[in-house]
Amino acid sequence: MAISGVPVLGFFIIAVLMSAQESWAIKEEHVIIQAEFYLNPDQSGEFMFDFDGDEIFHVDMAKKETVWRLEEFGRFASFEAQGALANIAVDKANLEIMTKRSNYTPITNVPPEVTVLTNSPVELREPNVLICFIDKFTPPVVNVTWLRNGKPVTTGVSETVFLPREDHLFRKFHYLPFLPSTEDVYDCRVEHWGLDEPLLKHWEFDAPSPLPETTENVVCALGLTVGLVGIIIGTIFIIKGLRKSNAAERRGPL
């Protein structure tokens, strides 16, 4: 789906407990962020809670239900999705007012920084996960496509919601399970209003380089030299020991 239209960022709330920006003489240990926004012309929004940089939950606007990042969280807490939907409705109304007051000024586009990495050290034919980390961008609208050997891949892909940053920009993670091989190459293609053209980040298996023959020869020669030196030194000590023993025998007992 191509990105089109002029984005207007809606009501964006960041509620920080014991924030470092506050003038209180208290050193924060943990930070909870409530982030919500509404976008036009997409008519889409998001409501989520973040704890120390990790998502706790978000509300699925289409299904009207709370989605916990980890199922275990839902066993110890609860959140009514209707509360988030009511907030988004207020955000939409506020956006209409703010848009008129700003004379329909669009939001400034900040292009993302994109990094592709693996979830764990890579071993051939061992299951792994490619991670496409999209960071430091606004507005929170991106299209992300995984490519294997230049062709789109959709099987098994997953993603996070838009995660807030302390500088009011956003970050997002996209995941692709895969089996590393020497034949396949991968790309994460990112589209955003701040980019003149789609941004591709490439990944392929990089086998460890074997030691060059000259290096192996040097290592072998060094090992041989060390071995010869050890033999020579050992022989010298043996000869000295024998000489001392013979001298003691010639002197006889006192």
UniProtKB/Swiss-Prot annotation:
An alpha chain of antigen-presenting major histocompatibility complex class II (MHCII) molecule. In complex with the beta chain HLA-DRB, displays antigenic peptides on professional antigen presenting cells (APCs) for recognition by alpha-beta T cell receptor (TCR) on HLA-DR-restricted CD4-positive T cells. This guides antigen-specific T-helper effector functions, both antibody-mediated immune response and macrophage activation, to ultimately eliminate the infectious agents and transformed cells. GO terms for molecular function: MHC class II protein complex binding; MHC class II receptor activity; peptide antigen binding; polysaccharide binding; T cell receptor binding. Residues 204-216 are annotated as: Connecting peptide. Induction: Up-regulated in dendritic cells upon maturation. It is a single-pass type I membrane protein. Changing E80A: Increases the interaction with HLA-DM complex and peptide exchange. Decreases the affinity of the interaction with TCR by more than five-fold. The record marks E80, N94 as: Pathogen-derived peptide antigen. Expressed in professional APCs: macrophages, dendritic cells and B cells (at protein level). Expressed in thymic epithelial cells (at protein level). GO terms for biological process: adaptive immune response; antigen processing and presentation of endogenous peptide antigen via MHC class II; antigen processing and presentation of exogenous peptide antigen via MHC class II; antigen processing and presentation of peptide or polysaccharide antigen via MHC class II; cognition; immune response; myeloid dendritic cell antigen processing and presentation; peptide antigen assembly with MHC class II protein complex. Residues 1-25 form the signal peptide. Disulfide bonds join C132-C188. There is a cross-link at K244 (Glycyl lysine isopeptide (Lys-Gly) (interchain with G-Cter in ubiquitin)). Residues 110-203 are annotated as: Alpha-2. It comes from Homo sapiens. The chain crosses the membrane at residues 217-239. This is HLA class II histocompatibility antigen, DR alpha chain. Changing R125A: Impairs the interaction with HLA-DM complex and peptide exchange. One of its GO terms (cellular component) is clathrin-coated endocytic vesicle membrane. Residues 26-216 are extracellular.
